[in-house]
């Protein structure tokens, strides 16, 4: 039986313990309690806990790894593929559009703490048993090159509420993305999501298979904002052109997180949650040090 690995990274903003955001609902089974006893039920959950490989399974895995490594890509081609990775992903999205990957509708069921729901007093006792699920990870994005913004402007209050207003908002922030984001750190207090009280960043958003399940849920949470980025410009364009994309609550931008010299379209220290879904496994180990 194949072992299903689970790798999730959620970085919570430091210094906000008195005002924690948590979801009001939980996964069907809490982390650590999904024990597979009946092999026929292997597909009932997205993952299983405490799985142990038999000697036969480990031997089979080593055999597969050896077979996979029998033919290696030439070093010069490795360098080329790494250097032009975004180009190849652009070609991929040009061919497949948003039809290749399925929406991750399971994401919020497995990780309800992503959602910005205030903790209710009557739920505190019940939530205490879930403390082992939650982490207070150190902000991995402390090197973001974006100055602290002294004065946040409520840009959305002026432009939301009509299709014309949303178009203007999207246009304004598209200009911000193309000009300020490329030239360097922001020189103005205006930035996407400046009026939000809860902010999520998804790294490696692709065609939006995590973005839109989250964004659809955030529709009833106007104080929340979702940032998403990808180093493939074709992927970002697919997200922006999607019918569910709302510039008043989401900002998609092109970014390579392995390049710590690139600025972000928002200031330091404002993120509550950072998602990297199937991202680290696609990056060369030597480059993960810059994330």
UniProtKB/Swiss-Prot annotation:
InterPro entries per the UniProt record, alphabetical = Methyltransf_25, METTL2/6/8-like, SAM-dependent_MTases_sf
Principal place where this protein is found?
mitochondrion
From which residue to which does the transit peptide run?
A: 1-21
UniProt EC number: 2.1.1.-
| Gene Ontology MF terms in the entry | mRNA methyltransferase activity; tRNA (cytidine-3-)-methyltransferase activity
Q: Where in the cell is it found?
A: Mitochondrion
Q: What is this protein called?
A: tRNA N(3)-cytidine methyltransferase METTL8, mitochondrial
Organism taxonomic ancestry: Eukaryota, Metazoa, Chordata, Craniata, Vertebrata
């Amino acid at each position: 039986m194949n072992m299903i690995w689970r790798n999730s990274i959620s970085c919570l903003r430091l210094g906000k313990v008195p005002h924690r955001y948590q979801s009001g609902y939980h996964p069907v089974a809490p982390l650590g309690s999904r024990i597979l006893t009946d092999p026929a039920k292997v597909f009932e959950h997205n993952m299983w806990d405490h799985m142990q490989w038999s000697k036969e399974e480990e031997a089979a895995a080593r055999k597969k790894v050896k077979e996979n490594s029998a033919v290696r890509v030439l070093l010069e081609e490795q360098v080329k593929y790494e250097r032009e990775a975004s180009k190849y992903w652009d070609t991929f999205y040009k061919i497949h559009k948003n039809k290749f990957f399925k929406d991750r509708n399971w994401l919020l069921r497995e990780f309800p703490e992503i959602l910005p729901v205030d903790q209710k007093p009557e739920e505190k006792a019940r939530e205490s048993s879930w403390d082992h699920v939650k982490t207070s990870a150190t902000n991995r994005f402390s090197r973001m090159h974006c100055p602290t913004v002294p004065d946040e402007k409520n840009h959305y209050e002026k432009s939301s509420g009509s299709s014309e207003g949303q178009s203007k908002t999207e246009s304004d922030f598209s200009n911000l993305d193309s000009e300020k984001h490329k030239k360097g750190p922001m020189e103005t207090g205006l930035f996407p999501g400046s009026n939000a009280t809860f902010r999520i960043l998804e790294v490696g958003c692709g065609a939006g298979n995590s973005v839109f399940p989250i964004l659809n849920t955030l529709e009833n949470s106007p104080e929340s904002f979702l940032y998403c980025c990808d180093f493939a410009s074709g992927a970002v364009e697919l997200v922006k052109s999607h019918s569910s994309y709302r510039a008043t609550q989401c900002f998609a931008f092109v970014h390579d997180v392995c390049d710590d010299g690139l600025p972000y379209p928002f200031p330091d220290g404002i993120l509550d949650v950072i998602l990297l879904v199937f991202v680290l496994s696609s990056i060369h180990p030597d480059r993960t040090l810059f994330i």
